Amino acid sequence: IRKSVFAFNLPSVDLINYEADDLIATYVNQILKIGAKVTIVSSDKDLMQLYKKNVRIYDPMKNKFISQEDIDKKFGVKPEKIIDVQALAGDSSDNVPGVPGIGVKTAAELINYYGDLETLLKNAKKIKQNKRRETLIENKQKAIISKKLVTLKKDVPVKVPYSDFIPKHIDKKKLYNFLRDM
C-alpha cells in the first residue's frame, strides 16, 4: 500500500502511538472544517462512525459505497451512535471488552431506547430484565472504557497538512513501473 501511495505522489503518514483510524479521523475533521467533501476508502467498520454529510466511505472489499442502510443493518443505529453500540457489544478483534452477554442487536435496542451509553448507564437500575440490569450495573466501567477505546481521536497532532493530499502531478514513469511490478 505504501508503494502505491508514493507511486501516485501522495504523502504517507504514520505517527507513533496513534492508529491509522485516528489519523484518518483527524484529517476528515480538518477537511470538513474547510467545507470540502471526503471519501474514505476502507473496509474497516470502525471508520463507519465518521459517516455523515460530506463524508462517504467506499468499501473496496465489497466494491461499493457504504450507505446509511448498510450502517443500520450492521449496527442498528445512526453513525453517531455506533460507538455506543460498540462500547456495549465489544469487539474481540480490537481488544474492546464491552459488556458480557450483550451483542450488537441488544446494544442497538438499548441505545435506540436510551439515546446514548451514558443515559443508559444512569438508568440501568430501571431496566426490567434482571440479568441485563445486573450485568450493566456490574460492568459499567467496562462499558465506559470500551467507549473510550472505540472512539476515534480527531485531534492527532499531525505534521503533514491535509493540503498535501490534494492530487499533484503524477510521475508517469514511476507510476508505470509500480503498476508493471505489481
Sequence positions of predicted segments:
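Long, highly charged low-complexity segments
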Residues: K173-M182
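Short, contiguous strand/loop micro-motifs
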Residues: Y162-S163
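Extended two-metal-dependent nuclease catalytic cores across DNA- and RNA-processing enzymes
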Residues: I1-K159
